Every structure is written in C-alpha cells, then in structure tokens.
C-alpha cells in the first residue's frame, strides 16, 4: 500500500582517484589561501531556511526510542583526541556546536567504543572544506582512517576531493534508483553555511548511509563485496581496516573549519534490533469484530478453485443519526452495509462502482482504487455520500457525490454520480485519498505529493496545485467554476498563486486522516520516505514541511519557500528501525475500554505494531506512547462507529478483515 524503496550498493572505479589522506598538506594550503583572501565563510553563519528543533536536544520520541546525545552543546565531555587523553585547543564549543577552528586540532574520538549503532549528526563545512566521520576506529595505527571506514564530509561545490560528501571513502557511493526515474547520482548536500544531516547505521542486518534524509547506499560489513572493494582500494595496505567489529566514533580534522552539532547515537542489540519505543504496554488483545460476517457477491475462492482478490477494507464508518448501521469500503470499488451487531451474518452491497475504479492489485496500483468514503452529516435526510477513487488508464483522482436510490435508502445509485473534482496524478503512488467531514460540516480531502521519490515535482510545497495538501470544500453549495464552494475562512482565499481549496500542505503520503469527535482535532499520519514516519495535528494554514523536511528533520537540498521556516513539526515521529509505513488511526471515544479513552490509535503496516498515543491540546509533542500490539498485524486502515468504538482492518483472503480491541 505505501511505497518503500529497495536498493543495491554501488561503488566506483578507484584507479585514478587522488587519495584524500595523502593530500592534507595541499588541503591546508588551500584553506589558508581562502582565509587570506577573505573568502572563508564561517560554518556558524547559517542561512535559516527551515524550522528547526532546538539544537542538541532529544525529542520525546527520540528519548523513548533509545537515542542519546554524544554532545550537549556546551562541553566537549565524552571526546578526546586520537591517542590522547584530552581534547586539543583546536576544537572549541561555539554557539552550540563543536568546531574545528584552530591549527593542529587533530582527529577526535569518543571515549566509548561502539559495535552496532545508529548515528545522526549535523555538520556545517567551510567553503572548499573537507572532514569525515569514521566508525570502528581502533588506536593501533598512526591514523584513525587506517582502521575505521570513513563517511566523507566536504563542500561538494568547491571541494577538491573526487570522493563526495556522504560517500564511504573509496568503498561505496550513492547511485540513481532507476526504478524511481532517477538518472543521475544523487547529491542531497546543502552548500557551505548551511547544516547538513548525516545518518549512519551499522548493524548485522545491514548498514546504511543517508544524507539529509535521502538514502545514499546500503552495505554489509565484511561480506564478499566489502572484501573485494577493500582489495581495490588503498586500504588493502592495512590488514585490520574495517574488521575490528567495534571501535570509536571519530570526527576528522582535515585542516579545514567544520562544525558539528546534534550528535546523537542509539546502540543496537546484537541482532540489530532496538527496544520497543514505548512508555508502557496496555493489557489488550484483538479479536474479530464480526466473526460470522459474509460478503454479498464475494467468496474466498471462485468455482474453478481460483483465489479471489483479498478483502482490503480501507474505510469503516457510519451515517450520523444512525448508530445501528455501518458502511464498509473495499479498495476494489465496492461499498457494503450491515447492522452494527457482532453476530451479523451478511454484509450487503450498498454500491458497486468497480466499473470506473482502477484495480489496486494491478501492476503499480497498490495505492490506487477506491480510497475514501464519507457519509454526508445529513445523510439520513438527503441520502448523499462522497467517495475518492482513481480512474483506470488516466490514474486521475476523482472526488464524487453519490445518492441513494429513491426507493431504497440501503442502496446507493451508481448512476447518480456527480463529479466534484478531478486531480491529475503524475505517478501511481502517494494518491492519499482519505476524506472526512469535519465538525464544521465541510469536506476535508487528503492528497499525497503525486508519488515517486524525493517529490520530483516539489508538489509538497507548491500551492498552485492541489497535491501534497489537505483540502477543505463546501459540498452543500456550488460556484460558477465548480460543483462546490470554497469556505470563506479557508486560509488562502484571495491569495494570488495559491489554490483556495488548500487547508494545510506539506504532506508526502497522508495515509488516513481522522477527526476527534470530542475536540474537533484533525489527525493525519504521513508516510515517510527513508527515515521518519509522522503523526500530525493539522492546523488551518499549516505547512507540515515535506519535501524540505521529513518529520522534524531536514530533507534534501531543495530551497524552501517563504513559509518553510514556520513549518510545523509532528506531535510524534518514529524512525525506520521501528516501522516503515505508518497507518493513521482514530481517537478512541467509546466507554468500552477505559484504558484507550481519548487516545489516538495508529499502526505500522510493515512492522505490524499498534500503539496508543496520548496528547493534550497545545502540547508540542505527545505525552505518552503505549504499545497495544507488539507486531505481526499489517493494518491498512482504522474505522469508527457512532459509539466511538475503533476498529482496525487488515487484508484477508478469507474475508475476515475487521478487528477490534478487547481487555485481556
């Protein structure tokens, strides 16, 4: 459902590469010439392009997930020079960063050795500058790079080294992901004067390097490919290179000014796993909500023995004013209805529009099909309901109004379709498509950025079109230009160059939105690309960062627009060691399970975990994250009935797709 990446490591020929470590004298001379010429730009003279978390602090989510600071922004405690007991005077703490700014500063290492870990840091390199991040460093050699593999750090514009920032020196480099349409080697670095975020994972499950949120490459320490690349590099002269199994983290002095901050590390278990990032566990179990339910017109297996397309239920909802009935939407294009009774036997077809809906099980169509259903607040009077689906062939997203049949309110009328909106989609993924009515009576529509990797059309921040946004429209009125009106208090009404339908923007792939019936808060889970999954509280006019930010962190090197500095951070985020594809849920308002009351339930499709999040109005971050299910349940969506009971849905070849929670 939610697209992920796959990658194969790549390297380059080293026959003509000028080695980095033997050119230090030239580097120092070059740096000195820059200083004399007045061309040096301090790495601390930052051009602020994006909203930033306070430096050298952990978010609550990071703390719960096991991250720790290696630098607190005020002291150099925990660091020393290579083969020394203390830190030289060439390294200073300046404005919350540890800065190499003096002569003979020397390479510095952590006091502690690390085996398996994830490391994240921000660096700011001077014009033409060069540095590096090494791992598994031992003190058996004259220089740390003779034992510890190095992730290159340099100014890619004016730097002299052919090994670019983020490359594993003379070993691995990024490569274009051709399946995503990339044709050039990616360079996600930002220029001197701006902070870059470097991420490194060293794990028995596989290692990875990312630059500003973009995965560069993956590798395995010590495998045949690794050994082959070592033999082709200068490191073959050092028998212990990259083979210590553990060692110090090292920041390199290459004779140029460089600054580091937000140096964070999380140690991994021997198998590469992490502890569950939760504040506690709820004593709950799950069960089929309607164990006897059969779907009209659908059987698990055809008469010839062929398995049918599994049930993929993306919406379970109710019509306001009718607590006795549920409406369930299948991604294939069929909506069913049945009594809200655990002993119910049959789900009857409410409407079948498969003839106009693209197939989600077709090649590339996993995030297409019938994606959204919302019953009009006055459905019991006017019989109106709304859907979002993707069209076959053109792959456009369609928002339509339907009505029930005149003589049967339990049957939708396929011929009653009134198209409100058609939105072109450049790719087949990140369609979004969740729709909800707010307490204000307006229809809210969530669209992703249009798909592929890295938001190639910059739709997340491009408000002249509708992708990457949550829209808000009045479906009870029409205008001369459309079959709906724009609410007068929409945030961008009358603003030149911005579509007035936009309520909030900066989303990558909002996989389900939901209103809290008690507070009116709009919750949105946004599926991340390579590092972070988000839970957001959506505010009118808010910019949620994509694609200049992912979660609360920098992404890529695209310049942000005028409002990027005010982007809103998620109230909760988790990294890809926890899960890789968030499924947004709903706030539990039933009285049946007191321990869930008022908590936002969400899941991860890849890890199969389910959690309950506690949050208070006005808080920047969620107060508590509790485990409901440890893993193994690939939840595709959540639903809610008139009583505030929350259900969750998984794919099922047997048709048993709807589940609920229960006390143990």
What are these regions (language model features)?
Residues 1-25:
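N-terminal secretory signal peptides that target proteins for export/translocation
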Residues 30-43:
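Bacterial N-terminal signal peptides
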Residues 49-273:
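Carbohydrate-interacting regions of secretory-pathway proteins
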Residues 399-407, 459-475, 538-539:
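Beta-propeller blade signature
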């Amino acid at each position: 459902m939610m697209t992920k990446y796959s990658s194969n490591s790549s390297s380059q020929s080293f026959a003509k590469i000028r080695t980095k470590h033997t050119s230090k004298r030239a580097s120092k001379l070059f740096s000195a010439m820059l200083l004399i010429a007045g061309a040096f730009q301090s790495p601390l003279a930052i051009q602020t392009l994006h909203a930033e978390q306070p430096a050298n602090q952990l978010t609550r989510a990071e703390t719960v997930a096991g991250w720790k600071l290696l630098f607190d922004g005020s002291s150099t405690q925990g660091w020393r020079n290579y083969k020394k007991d203390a830190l030289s005077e060439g390294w200073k703490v300046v404005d919350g960063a540890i800065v190499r700014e003096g002569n003979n500063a020397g390479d510095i290492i952590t006091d502690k050795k690390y085996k398996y870990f994830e490391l994240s840091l921000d660096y700011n390199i001077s014009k033409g500058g060069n540095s590096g991040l090494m791992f598994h460093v031992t003190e058996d050699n004259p220089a740390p790079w003779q034992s510890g593999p190095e992730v290159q750090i340099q100014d890619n514009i004016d730097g002299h080294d052919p090994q670019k920032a983020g490359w594993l020196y003379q070993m691995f480099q990024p490569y274009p992901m051709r399946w995503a349409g990339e044709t050039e080697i990616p360079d996600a670095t930002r220029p001197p004067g701006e902070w870059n975020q470097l991420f490194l994972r060293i794990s028995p499950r596989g290692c990875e390097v990312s630059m500003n949120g973009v995965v560069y490459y993956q590798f395995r320490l010590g495998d045949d490919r690794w050994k082959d690349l070592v033999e082709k590099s200068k490191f073959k002269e050092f028998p212990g290179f990259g083979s210590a199994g553990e060692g110090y983290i090292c920041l390199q002095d290459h004779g140029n000014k460089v600054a580091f901050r937000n140096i964070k590390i999380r140690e991994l278990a021997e198998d590469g796993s992490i502890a569950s990032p939760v504040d506690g566990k709820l004593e709950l179990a799950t069960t089929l909500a309607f164990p006897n339910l059969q779907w009209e017109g659908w059987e698990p297996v055809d008469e010839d023995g062929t398995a049918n397309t599994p049930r993929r239920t993306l919406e379970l909802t109710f019509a306001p004013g009718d607590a006795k009935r549920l409406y369930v939407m299948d991604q294939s294009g069929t909506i069913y209805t049945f009594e809200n009774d655990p002993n119910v036997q049959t789900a009857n077809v409410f409407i079948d529009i498969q003839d106009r809906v693209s197939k989600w099980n077709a090649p590339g169509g996993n995030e297409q099909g019938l994606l959204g259903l919302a019953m009009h607040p006055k459905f019991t009077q006017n019989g109106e309901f709304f859907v979002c689906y993707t069209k076959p062939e053109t792959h456009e997203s369609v928002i339509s109004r339907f009505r029930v049949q005149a003589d049967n309110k339990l049957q939708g009328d396929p011929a009653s379709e009134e198209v409100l909106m058609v939105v072109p989609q450049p790719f087949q993924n990140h369609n979004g498509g969740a729709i909800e009515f707010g307490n204000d009576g307006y229809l809210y529509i969530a669209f992703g950025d249009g798909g592929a990797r890295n938001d190639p059309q910059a739709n997340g921040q491009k408000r002249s079109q509708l992708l990457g946004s949550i829209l808000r429209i009045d479906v009870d009125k029409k205008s001369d230009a459309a079959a709906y009106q724009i609410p007068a208090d929409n945030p961008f009404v009358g603003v030149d160059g911005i579509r007035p339908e936009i309520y909030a923007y900066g989303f990558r792939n909002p996989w389900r939105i939901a209103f809290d019936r008690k507070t009116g808060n709009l919750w949105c889970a946004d599926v991340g690309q390579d590092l972070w999954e988000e839970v957001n509280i959506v505010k009118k006019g808010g910019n949620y960062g994509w694609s200049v930010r992912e979660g609360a962190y920098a992404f890529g090197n695209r310049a942000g627009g005028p409002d990027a500095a005010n982007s809103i951070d998620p109230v909760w985020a988790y990294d890809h060691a926890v899960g890789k594809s968030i499924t947004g849920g709903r706030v539990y308002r039933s009285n049946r399970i007191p321990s869930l009351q008022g908590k936002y339930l969400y899941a991860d499709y890849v890890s199969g975990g389910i959690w309950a999040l506690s949050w208070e109005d006005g808080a920047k971050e969620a107060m508590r994250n509790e485990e409901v299910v440890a893993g193994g349940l690939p939840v595709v969506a959540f639903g809610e009935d008139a009583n505030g009971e929350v259900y969750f849905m998984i794919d099922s070849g047997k048709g048993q797709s709807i589940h609920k929670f229960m006390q143990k």
